[in-house]
Amino acid sequence: MSKLIVPQWLLPKGVAACSSTRIGGVSLPPYDSLNLGAHCGDNPDHVEENRKRLFAAGNLPSKPVWLEQVHGKDVLKLTGEPYASKRADASYSNTPGTVCAVMTADCLPVLFCNRAGTEVAAAHAGWRGLCSGVLEETVSCFADNPENILAWLGPAIGPRAFEVGGEVREAFMAVDAKASAAFIQHGDKYLADIYQLARQRLANVGVEQIFGGDRCTYTENETFFSYRRDKTTGRMASFIWLI
């Protein structure tokens, strides 16, 4: 049975969301077992079976639109029309039955909806995309006001495991000096709190209803894939859609 995480937030009627773990698939080590990524060296047949299991367990209304994630800030609006490119790190929809999805294995997945339950989005926020403004770009796609938007921070590498160089801290502080609070000196490097950085960025554009942000993909090795921990590994995915 595929084990899913159901986000704990004030989800309005008409919106559904879930996030996968590594549990309940057919992939063999090091992709064991619910790997959803077709780009990381796993057997394609295993990935396809894993996706089928996930779609059934999550009761997804349609196949998600998989993005070509590049650690940037572009948002793909899912209109149902053919896409010239799926090269983006977030997707937005106001169409029932269209599934927004992002893949992660340490980077931060962020799911969005408005309180009226008429708009949804999903964003992939590694530190580069987060620093560049992928969350702000995603919020800007909403017709609703930021104060009416809810955000859920899905499983990512935790603040005790995310070691970065000083250049990462400097990049965030160049945008917002308050970002320094999310970094703790650790030898000649820093431990970064990607959840705190995301909350700061969202609050700066008026999104204050923020949930989640309490898991660690790096240390919870039986539950999550982690690229930093294992290098060759699978991918989880987070999904949101209008019913």
What are these regions (language model features)?
Residues 1-243:
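Active-site microenvironment for binding and transforming phosphate-containing groups
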